[in-house]
Structure formats: C-alpha cells, structure tokens
C-alpha cells in the first residue's frame, strides 16, 4: 500500500526549488569579472585603463544590470572592462567600504563607477541602456548620446544604415533628416531647436537624426553630399528632394519652412577678393616665386572663398596692407593666395586649413606666430621675430614607433605577430593630433618583440607606391597586420586608449589560445 506523504512535508522541498530561481537568472557573461578582494581590484585598475564597476547591494539587486552589462561587455570587448562587486557578500564588504561605495539608502540598490588610467573618473549617471553605456565606454569623456536628452524623445534616432533605409522605405510622412557628428558645435546649437520642432510637428512630419561621423557611413555621406556637419536633408515618400541649409534656425523657423519646403536659393556669387582692388597683392601658381624673389619681406595668407575665418580676417589683413603700403617696401608687403584656385602652391606648402600664414624672407619660408588683427600684422612686419627652430620630424624623435619605408615595410612586418601601422602625412592636422597617442601606445608595448606600432610617411617619394598599394586614401589611415598580412582597417578610436585596448585584445587572444593548447596537452 502506497504511503501518503503529508503536504507540509513537501513544503521545504518546494521552497528549496523556488529560492534559487533568481540566483540562476543572475548568470552573467564570462567577460564580466567578479571581484571581492581589494588587491584584485587594485591590480585590475593598474593593468586596465578603462573600467566600469558595478557595485550592488546584493546578488539579486544586480540581476537586471548584469544581464544588460553582459551584452555591453561583448560590444566593448578589447576597449573596456566591466567588473561586478557584490557588497552584500561578507567577503566583498571590506572592498566596498574601501572604495567609498554607500548603498545604505533603501532605494539605492546599485552604483556604477568608472575608473580610467588607474584612478576614479566619474560616477556613471547617464541612461542605463545598451547604447548609452557602450557609447560611454568607447569615449568616456565624450558627450552623451542625443537621444539621452529627454527633450529629444520625438526625434527618431537612427543607429545604422539598415534602419535608415527601412525608414525611407516605410515612412509615409515627409522626413527631415539631420546627419551630424557628436563633437560638432553647430550641431549642438541647432539640436534643441530641431527637437522642439519635432515635438510641435509630431504626427505630421518625421524629424530624425543620425550620427554619420564613423567611417562605416561613408556611402551615406557620399550619396547625400555630406561635406560638413550638420547636413539636413528633406525626403518625401523615401525620395531625397533637397537640403535644408539654414543652420542658424530656431524651432519656429524649421516649422515654418516645413509648411512649404523649398530648395535652397542659389547664392549670388561673391566677387573674388583679387577683383576687389586694395593693397594686398594676389599671387598665383605662375607668379609666386618671382614675386617673393623681388620682395625681401612678404607675409602670405593662403585662403579659400568659402572659409568663414578667412572672411573675418580679410578686412584686418587689408587694412594692415594699406598702412604698410604707405611705408614703402621697408616694412614688407602682404599678399594672398586663393588655395582653391592655385592648387600647386597649396600642395607645395602643405596647406591643410584656412587661413594659413606663411612668411618669406629673401625667398626663404619661415614660421609665423598666430596673427589675426591689423595691429598684430603691422607690428610683426615692422619687426619680424626670429623664426623658432622647427620641431624635429617624428621619425627623428626617440620613440618606440618603427618608421618604415617602401623598401623595408614587408620584410619588417613579416617578423611581427601583431603590427598596427599608421599611414600619415606630416602636414595633416588629424595626423598631428594622433601622433602623441600612437607614440604612447608604442611605448606601452616596447618590451614585447612580437608587437609593433609602425608608421609610414606617405608624402615621401619612395613610399607613395606602397601607400597606393595599401589603399590609403586619407590621412591618417591605420591598418592591422598579422605576420605581414593585412587583416583589417582600424578606425575605431585614434587615441592612446583606443590603440592600447586594440593591441591588448590581440595579445590576450594569444594567451587564451596558448592556454587551450596547454589544456589539450
């Protein structure tokens, strides 16, 4: 006869089965490091320079955050590290106290702290979403995502080309799309007005925004002629009609324009500066060399007709030229070159931004301080400062960067397991900005003979064929090579943090593979 077990005897078993459900659901990615020992955290912060730590009141309190951070960890692998400390655990309480984590308030279950370069950086107080945390870890000091602004809830935020194409295909309402870059000051100025207009026009129009600064959006930028930021395009039934170019608009201006969208009015062509007359000499590719030979002291302004800073400086430059003209040739003369027309001169003197000033003394070119006003032009021309000695070329400086040429490029990289190569031009502003970061990354791995940070000056004649073979179309360009074979283009983050994180991921991958081989043996 079967024995009947009282129901109350089964209760402890039921409770035992139910209790671990939240514990089992708190499983998290192996990419998240659980830490309880202060020494382990100290070591981690010393060896990783971009760390986000989740401190929780208990394991249960961390459940939803761990689930989210597991997906984030995968997305930022090689660029950032995520850790978890359970402050409710007896072993971890000492660590939480030492790190000044206070979770005593009833409604406070977790804290997210960010550490950079071994030190506390900031408390994470942005949106707790996948996109926001990923964006933060990829650029901890960068601006928040536009969509994090509560006022931008009526703007449609597009993340990728697939979503962009889907919007154009399926949306019946007219679309005003802002292509922008997060760092762009003009974009930041117009964004509040754009989002206010989106709210006012909700249900009638779609106002959307898309960060197209990353290189993955080159096709979109080419298709819609995105030459600067912001570029605002108007669509009807998925078809691009024209651009909206009033970047100083208010929300009311945008709303009013959308009532009757019209293409930009053709601008009345400006009179070329050279045709206006005045005391500034306007030089060309043909007469430049002869002019600087005939005049012992010449200050030349390289400009572009569309350049706002040039237009602002032009009257100051012209007024100074009039004063100097009255003094005869004793104080020198001021001259100008339209770099958009006289391209040979612009290339010869590596003109990469406008306006650029060059000073010529008896035909020789010298460096010029930052002159912008009538007074500074006159004072400097009356008594030109002795030109400071030029900074040594990058390849002449003592660094850990390997400066290669077309002759030794292949042979050198064949001996390196991991090589990150920077193709650059010495005059390029973006290259100048990246060089100290790349140099610091090279120094960080100088003791590892399998790793190299190398550089190629694409301006040098004997390197031009190599740069062309490696499909270098812009400066700087970064390529990763494995024993001399091209693997991928690096275009994520041209900073010391970005470079070192990328290389460290490659090295950690080597260690993982070595560990697996040892286990197999």
Swiss-Prot record:
Reactions performed catalytically: Catalyzes the rearrangement of -S-S- bonds in proteins
UniProt GO BP: protein folding
Entry EC number(s): 5.3.4.1
Renumbered ranges of motif Prevents secretion from ER: 518-521
Signal peptide residue numbers: 1-25
Disulphide connectivity of cysteines: 184-187, 307-310, 428-431
PANTHER family with a match to the protein in the record: PROTEIN DISULFIDE-ISOMERASE A5, PROTEIN DISULFIDE-ISOMERASE C17H9.14C-RELATED
Name of the protein in its database record: Protein disulfide-isomerase A5
């Amino acid at each position: 006869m079967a024995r009947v077990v009282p129901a109350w005897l089964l209760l402890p078993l039921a409770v035992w089965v139910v209790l671990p459900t939240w514990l089992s659901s708190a499983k998290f990615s192996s990419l998240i490091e659980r830490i309880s020992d202060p020494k382990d955290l100290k070591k981690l912060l010393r060896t990783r320079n971009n760390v986000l730590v989740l401190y929780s009141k208990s394991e249960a309190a961390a459940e939803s955050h761990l689930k989210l951070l597991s997906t984030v960890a995968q997305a930022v692998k090689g660029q950032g590290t995520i850790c978890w400390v359970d402050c409710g655990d007896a072993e971890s309480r000492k660590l939480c106290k030492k790190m000044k984590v206070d979770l005593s308030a009833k409604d406070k279950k977790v804290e997210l702290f960010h550490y950079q370069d071994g030190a506390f950086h900031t408390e994470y107080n942005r949106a707790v979403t996948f996109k926001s945390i990923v964006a933060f870890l990829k650029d901890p000091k960068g601006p928040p995502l536009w969509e994090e602004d509560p006022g931008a809830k009526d703007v449609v935020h597009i993340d990728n080309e697939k979503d962009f194409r889907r919007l154009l295909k399926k949306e019946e309402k007219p679309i005003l799309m802002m292509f922008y870059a997060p760092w762009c000051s003009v974009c930041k100025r117009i964004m509040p007005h754009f989002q206010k207009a989106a709210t006012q026009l909700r249900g009638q129009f779609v106002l959307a925004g898309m960060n197209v600064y990353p290189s993955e959006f080159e096709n979109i930028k080419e298709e819609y002629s995105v030459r600067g930021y912001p570029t605002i395009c108007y669509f009807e039934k998925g078809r691009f009609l024209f651009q909206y170019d009033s970047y100083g608009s208010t929300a009311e201006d945008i709303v009013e324009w959308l009532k009757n969208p019209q293409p930009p009015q053709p601008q009345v062509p400006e009179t070329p500066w050279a045709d206006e007359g005045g005391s500034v000499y306007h030089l060309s590719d043909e007469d430049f060399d002869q002019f600087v030979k005939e005049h012992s002291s010449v200050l030349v302004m390289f400009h572009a007709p569309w350049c706002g800073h040039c237009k602002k400086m032009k009257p100051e430059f012209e007024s100074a030229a009039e004063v100097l003209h009255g003094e005869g040739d004793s104080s020198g003369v001021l001259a100008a070159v339209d770099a958009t027309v006289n391209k040979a001169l612009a290339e010869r003197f590596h003109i990469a931004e406008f306006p650029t000033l060059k000073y010529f003394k008896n035909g020789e070119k010298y460096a010029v301080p930052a002159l912008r006003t009538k007074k500074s032009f006159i004072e400097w021309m009356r008594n030109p400062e002795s030109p400071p000695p030029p900074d040594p070329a990058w390849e002449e400086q003592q660094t850990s960067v390997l400066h290669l040429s077309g002759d030794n490029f292949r042979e050198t990289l064949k001996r390196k397991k991991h090589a990150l190569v920077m193709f650059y031009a010495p005059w390029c502003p973006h290259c100048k900005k990246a060089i100290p970061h790349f140099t610091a990354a090279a120094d960080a791995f100088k003791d590892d003979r399998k790793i190299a940070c190398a550089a190629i000056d694409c301006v040098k004649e004997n390197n031009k064929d190599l740069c062309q073979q490696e499909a270098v179309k812009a400066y700087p360009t970064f390529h990763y090579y494995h024993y001399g074979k091209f693997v991928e283009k690096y275009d994520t983050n041209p900073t010391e943090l970005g470079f070192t994180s990328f290389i460290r991921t490659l090295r950690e991958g080597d260690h993982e593979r070595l560990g697996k081989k040892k286990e197999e043996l």
